[in-house]
Regions:
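Small/polar-rich, solvent-exposed N-terminal microdomains that initiate assembly or binding
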Residues: 1-58
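Short alpha-helix boundary/capping segments
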Residues: 6, 63, 82-89
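Long, highly charged amphipathic alpha-helices
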Residues: 9, 13-17, 89, 93-100
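Conserved NTP-handling cores and scaffolds of large molecular machines
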Residues: 18-22, 61, 98-105
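A general structural signal for short secondary-structure junctions and capping/turn motifs
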Residues: 31-33, 67, 129-133
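A broadly used, surface-exposed interaction patch
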Residues: 49-77, 86
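Oligomerization/assembly interface segments of phage tail-like spikes and tubes
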Residues: 65-82, 92, 134-144
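Acidic-leaning, charged glycine-interspersed low-complexity segments
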Residues: 89, 96-146
Length: 146
């Protein structure tokens, strides 16, 4: 069973980390305006493949309980206004913060944060599906969220 509350906790901790390291307002959600903001836009949630290999936990009285599965949260980091020196600088700061903080501690769980490659076609599809113009961004993911 997936602990749904930890996904928001993970994304909140990610936003807090970016806010701390960039000194800029960080918003969780789809980019919607041109204020000086960094957006963390989660666009895909998947069960981590390694979760399928976990044996059920054995609790007293030999009851087998399924392990909590691990989630990978794919997200885009977008700085607005995007195509300005300030926006590009904020985007570079956010990318650097992700690279310098590869592990976030969420309660008693450590999750991995990393940049990721995203095919141009997939990226264009994400923006098109959301009805917003394609712009420069950082593709990243959180591995191990529970």
């Amino acid at each position: 069973m997936v602990n749904i509350m930890s996904i928001p906790s993970t994304l909140t901790a990610l936003c807090d980390m970016l806010r701390t390291h960039t000194g800029v307002n960080v918003v969780l959600g789809r980019p919607e305006d041109s204020t000086s903001t960094i957006y963390v836009w989660p666009w895909f949630l998947e069960e981590a493949p390694e979760s399928h290999n976990l044996p059920p936990a054995v609790v007293p009285n030999e009851i087998r309980v399924p392990q909590s599965s691990s989630q990978n949260i794919h997200f885009l980091v977008i700085a607005t206004p995007a195509l300005t020196i300030e926006g590009l600088s904020r985007l570079a700061q956010a990318r650097q913060a992700i690279l310098e903080n590869p592990v976030l501690n969420i309660g008693e769980v450590n999750v991995q944060v990393m940049t990721s490659n995203l095919e141009a076609e997939t990226l264009a599809s994400v923006f098109q599906a959301a009805g917003i113009p394609l712009t420069i961004c950082v593709s990243a993911m959180v591995r191990g969220a529970r």
